[in-house]
Amino acid sequence: MNLADVPKEKLSPGMRQYADLKEKYQDCILFFRLGDFYEMFFEDAILVSRELELTLTGKECGLEERAPMCGVPYHSVDLYLKRLIDRGYKIAICEQLTDPALSKGLVERDVIRIVTPGTLIDSTMLEDDSNNYICCLYYGNDGSCALCFADISTGEMSLAVPQETSDLTVRIIDLLSRYMPAELILNSQAMSLKSVMDFIRVRLQCTVTVREDTCFDLEQGRGTLCEQFGVSSLCLLYTSDAADDTPCVD
């Protein structure tokens, strides 16, 4: 039973709350807090029960058929998150925002964080002897290209700007090989770099998210970085005069 095929108006209030949140985070597994457990329903429950070898049960949801359900205890959730992250999944953590004992109606809930392979900061989920990079790759219609690597757990960030040449894809693959990111975000035009995409699929095997080119606005990105680091110009972040594939921002 897929949630997208279910008439939302027929769902119980609690399950409708779950459906509304799941609609906002369709690319994530939704961990929905119910008391002392994080529960998953419908296709998420089927997926997680298979990946983690959990018992698949059912829950009344307002339909004739019970919604597939599985869950994990909140006090040991990190163990389960780590196993899913290692398999490349993204998880949206939904918490109870009001006290169930004091709530007269439906407990207020919302997603408070999203856990992905490249955004881990919890030391229990990280390897002690290696970095955990997330990479953003942009490739423009005019041949412009840039890659940014960040290890959010340490604050390390590097930028590389390979120049348009006949071996551009080789340079991109070399950079990806050096950093071996756990997660990759790229624009839709970058999908046209066939050898790069083959390398990502076969060698990196990391979590990949494709965003529309409109998400890669240069001025907006420049302003966000200046605000984040408290500088008036990004030139103040440069640590080298590199103009090719040598990382030039630290």
Predicted features and spans:
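Basic, polar low-complexity surface loops/patches
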Residues: M1-S240
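Single conserved hydrophobic/aromatic residue that forms the stacking wall/gate
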Residues: Y238-D250
